[in-house]
Curated annotation (Swiss-Prot):
Name of the protein: DDB1- and CUL4-associated factor 16
Keyword Nucleus found: yes
UniProt subunit comment: Interacts with DDB1 and CUL4A.
Pathway assignment: Protein modification; protein ubiquitination
Alphabetized Pfam families for the sequence: DCA16 (PF15349)
GO biological process: protein ubiquitination
Keyword Acetylation: yes
Function: Functions as a substrate recognition component for CUL4-DDB1 E3 ubiquitin-protein ligase complex, which mediates ubiquitination and proteasome-dependent degradation of nuclear proteins.
GO CC field: Cul4-RING E3 ubiquitin ligase complex; nucleoplasm
Originating gene: DCAF16
Keywords: Acetylation, Nucleus, Ubl conjugation pathway
Organism: Homo sapiens (Human)
Main location: nucleus
Coiled-coil positions: none
Amino acid sequence: MGPRNPSPDHLSESESEEEENISYLNESSGEEWDSSEEEDSMVPNLSPLESLAWQVKCLLKYSTTWKPLNPNSWLYHAKLLDPSTPVHILREIGLRLSHCSHCVPKLEPIPEWPPLASCGVPPFQKPLTSPSRLSRDHATLNGALQFATKQLSRTLSRATPIPEYLKQIPNSCVSGCCCGWLTKTVKETTRTEPINTTYSYTDFQKAVNKLLTASL
């Protein structure tokens, strides 16, 4: 499930800013994550709940290489759209990293209960009342997912909208664009001042750590 490295071959090396973006992507690519997770390439035989926690734990290791997002760096946002990146995998298990959605052409709604079916984990409903370990695990998982969903929803509500014509650009074109035209277009149509969001990786790590403490 290792991420594919971006292909910057078509980028103009005469523009220092694009070179800087390429270097930025290479430094934070999934290659580092692949090497660190080499020994954990196979998922252990765990219960659905423990399996989810195991996946989140692996992705949390990768998150230590994440850097602050630059709203003007479209190349990084395009990298986030690549379905092979750990960020996309994390979205698939319900913790959607949509804090960069202010310049992503098409936004996806965040449901009240994030979908978990894509990774083989059944959706959890209300926390169980039994004092068993399983019920405590369910309650903690629910809390972590609800926390992440609430934070991401707040971020989306504060996201800077982009012009309507940018919404017409297919995601496939965005993720495969290496000519620099889309980068230039987005830079000209998005705000340059810092965007205030409520989502933080520290908060996310606290929520996930609570999950792992209870279930592993």
